[in-house]
């Protein structure tokens, strides 16, 4: 049997701040998770999204340090409509999260916007333009 892709893991500096951001994107994360060193959430697609604090990673990899420079990954969230892309981008940036690129109509047929989570990871918001 071949390995199965199952989890996308994020290493975070502040668990509560990171989970607050992802709750705004509709993820159902319990409030008590804010104080945990590891959080694991099953997504409707069957994949899991996991968060670990830097201290958790360093507990088994003592010399590990967070990567420097730009984001190394991007998580993309599909929105129901182009208007929802605009609305979600506005809500996140008004709440103080970094907007990396304001919504635009991409040549590949989607309304697209780019934000950053509290750890600087890229988070894409998109919707098909044909659904507008």
What are these regions (language model features)?
Residues 35, 105:
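Residue-level "edge-of-site" marker
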Residues 107-110:
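Short, small/polar residue-rich loop motifs at catalytic or cofactor-binding pockets
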């Amino acid at each position: 049997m071949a390995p199965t892709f199952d989890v996308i893991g994020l290493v975070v500096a502040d668990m509560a701040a990171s989970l607050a951001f992802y709750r705004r994107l509709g993820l159902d994360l319990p409030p008590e998770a804010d104080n945990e060193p590891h959080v694991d959430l099953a997504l409707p697609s069957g994949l899991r999204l996991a968060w670990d604090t830097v201290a958790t990673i360093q507990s088994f990899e003592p010399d590990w340090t967070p990567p420097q420079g730009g984001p190394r990954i991007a998580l993309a969230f599909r929105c129901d409509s182009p208007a929802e892309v605009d609305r979600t981008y506005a809500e996140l940036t008004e709440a103080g999260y970094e907007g990396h690129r304001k919504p635009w109509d991409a040549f590949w047929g989607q309304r697209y916007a780019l934000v950053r989570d509290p750890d600087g990871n890229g988070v894409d918001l998109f919707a098909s333009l044909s659904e507008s």
